[in-house]
């Protein structure tokens, strides 16, 4: 079948992906003696859809997977999704809420049925989208963190760590989300600076000798105070340490204590201590053996330990009621505006409460030492290396991990309680009953933090706790590709769990990617209205549909108008369909070792043009190869030209550069090496040189050029395949047979290796000279204002043998009438170009008067531009106020105009 005239990605992508997957090409293969290469997909939330960050990282993982698969490794890319406890429960609860049903109306069992139902219908969206991106994980091994095998691993770990004394139950202060009704980890807390107040309140001394003025930003927790504190070296209050004050409203007696935690400069230097509602106060309370009185319910209302008139009030209503009461008693001294950090839940944006609750914790200190030892020994490396510091700092300051969550969706904690509240940790209820002597038991209602099961992902997916062949072969895995935002949440925890439970690190390297931002460097977010959907970049989207997408479901609907305005301005014609390959090439080109990635659609357009260029180059090659002798027979004589040897040598350089780039995770450099070889060397130079050979060469030369056209293109397609899989497969199917290569798919063919015998330094040097001569000739044509249609002669003073060899190429590429070697250039007014020790001149009869007039006019124009630029740069308000980049741009313009003027004046002078 003939290759289509233009590259239409949609049909090609659909056809090839289905063929690859159904043929089982993505499956891990067990080749004896081949090295193992394994990547674990960071399991996306089952609730999720593919966002730009996913698409970026999945492109890089797939490029590595395809590269190593083609390099002959036993390659496994392990896919799967995360049950995403909180996120999934929120989604399903919202759906029920729309029907005026709460999860409590349904009960736990029915609610979980609804969640599994939802997962069955919507849970595969993200994996469908991954397929659209051309990713090639082993789908036959796809896992879900709530699968039976993974759940078994979770239970085994919990029981094992409990028996080792690393998991314990205790009453501790946790971050409590009153909307979700669960504890959340420190890492799920978003603290933002907000406007508030600081109140000063008088606490009367119990002996009636006066009062202490306390400064607080949380007056509603006053009812739970169990002390007031001053700094031990604060002379203002030294005489009061050990005395007691009367707690307003609650009318309890509480002590005045001294603790270095108190900041003498904050407020009055006296602070209230509420151990049950503040993390710092909890620590103070532990040091001074203070009682912890919790005055809030789990939904942030005042509880039964408060005076009757406050019970049942929302925390903020209680605040106002309490302030009014203090005012009435003359105890409220002042209320001053104050900026403070407010902790909110990253899912609900609710203000979190430090809450004293019974929770399960994991002791982290010993595990953290193992995590630190892994980087110290070199077992684990971060790329870029500077992320090691971030990892290390967190592990050195680690706190015990609260692993329990008050949710219904997730891995239920394998602990059972008897009627007396005694608990038994076991693999099954039957095992727990044996421990309890057959007593009636009830399972703990809590589930484990989602990150608990995620921390086991690298080895649980390989069959642990069973000692499977896959576990032996693939652990430690090769590399984890992840964002810097989950180094704490996930990376460090995987390292600690894996080291402790298997004795091995989970991966040898962690490649930390940057964050994909918009073209202006802004973080992509729904509220900013700057989110791009990778599928829209593949398929294209009309501006109206894009606006609708960006303005739907906004938390603040008032933003819709400004988002629509910005979107219509940025994308007046919507977004064009770039296809998967162009999008992947764009992502690869942006994958530098920096922290942030600015995604610019112009790049996607540039790489779509690249795909079109590669397609058209292949069409040209096929037109000159199909039905012709392509030199596949070994006994056929071939006469390779310098051009043939040069392109073969340049290909070796590109192959070497790509290998180095993949080894260093420099996907940007791999993309650049492919781009520059295909566009700048194969298309712009070699195809033009090949035309000369094919049109004017001997049969042996033509055969050699066809052989080179085919083999270099076939190798280039294999070289580019990991980055742009679809177009390379489609083209390879047509080109490979002509290069004498046979196989079912490019993705199963061997990755190109450098062939030192193809370096050809002599040919490379001669072709470099040819390029310089052609470029000099093009410059001369430009200076003389010659149209491409004017085929004029060129004379070159230099080595006649070299010139005569290169002449046919120069005629074609320089659009010349002929090229002659001369011992000396003729006397003429035409400009002369120098290339090494060669001098060259176009032989053109020119109308001197007309040319002088043209040059004079151009000189006057350039002088005007120079004056404008100089005036601008002499203006202090421009230089001082304009952005540095704008000033530099103006300086560069001035330098360019000055160089141009020099050239034009020299040409004018030569004409006399």
Curated annotation (Swiss-Prot):
Gene3D superfamilies: HUPs (3.40.50.620), Isoleucyl-tRNA Synthetase, Domain 1 (1.10.730.10), Valyl-tRNA synthetase, C-terminal domain (1.10.287.380), Valyl/Leucyl/Isoleucyl-tRNA synthetase, editing domain (3.90.740.10). Pfam families: Anticodon_1, tRNA-synt_1, Val_tRNA-synt_C. Catalyzes the attachment of valine to tRNA(Val). As ValRS can inadvertently accommodate and process structurally similar amino acids such as threonine, to avoid such errors, it has a 'posttransfer' editing activity that hydrolyzes mischarged Thr-tRNA(Val) in a tRNA-dependent manner. The gene is valS. Its EC number is 6.1.1.9. A motif ('KMSKS' region) lies at residues 523-527. Residues 847-911 form a coiled coil. A motif ('HIGH' region) lies at residues 44-54. This is Valine--tRNA ligase. Keywords: Aminoacyl-tRNA synthetase, ATP-binding, Coiled coil, Cytoplasm, Ligase, Nucleotide-binding, Protein biosynthesis.
